[in-house]
Amino acid sequence: VNFIFNNLSHEEKVDFSCNNYPKKKNPGTAFVYHTSDTYLIGTSLNNLLSDKKENDFFDDLLVPIFNHHNFSDKIKYIRRTNDIRNQPYTGWGMFLQRDDLIKLNSLLQSSERIKYFSKEFLDEGLQRTEDKGLVAIKQSDIFYNNGFWAARFDKNIFGCKEDLMIPFMSGFGGITVVFLPNSMMYYYFSDNFTFSWYSAVYAAHNIKPLC
């Protein structure tokens, strides 16, 4: 099966990303997810930085944040194309330790996050605004907004005043990182295509109420 993972050079990846999924809907009207689209985002970011001192979004913008907050050395590496462009894969190819997830959750929960990231963009992704994003999986009440997935939980389950929108990140094969509204986090890394995590939400609520 031809997929963006099979293409090693920057030119091949851009060609695949642009030509294998023709546009069918107007932007912002229907949820469509392609991992290859994230590669185009990374390419666009580096193109925007090409005339600046910081010309690599990963090494020059993200790694300094990781350094400042004492993330592991593993997270400071990302897979890249095997050509002179040396383009970061962007949507995949990173490596994390468990402690990196804890530090990421702490950063996203703190006010310091707005020093590095757009407050509006991140608040939307973390379900802190009225903009809940687009429905991604209707039958499961799953949404997608600014790089984050979110699951809707009925307010009556936890005795809340409003339904809960719980943001999470999801990766191929069985990777889940859930950012709970009580500041707790749940993560599960596997390669057996297990994506069930709702029981962890109920357990977290018993430890510390979600609302």
Q: Residue ranges of each PLM-predicted region?
A:
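Short alpha-helical interface patches
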Residues: 14-18, 98, 120-127
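Short, conserved, surface-exposed binding loops centered on an aromatic residue
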Residues: 25, 93-96, 136-139
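Short, flexible micro-motifs
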Residues: 31, 96, 174
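Catalytic-site signature segments of enzymes, centered on catalytic residues
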Residues: 1-92
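Well-ordered alpha-helical segments within folded domains of soluble proteins
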Residues: 34-44, 97-106, 184-185
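Alpha-helix initiation and capping sites
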Residues: 35, 55-59, 95-102, 115-119
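Catalytic loop of the DD-peptidase/beta-lactamase superfamily, centered on the K-T-G motif
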Residues: 50-52, 67, 85-90, 109-211
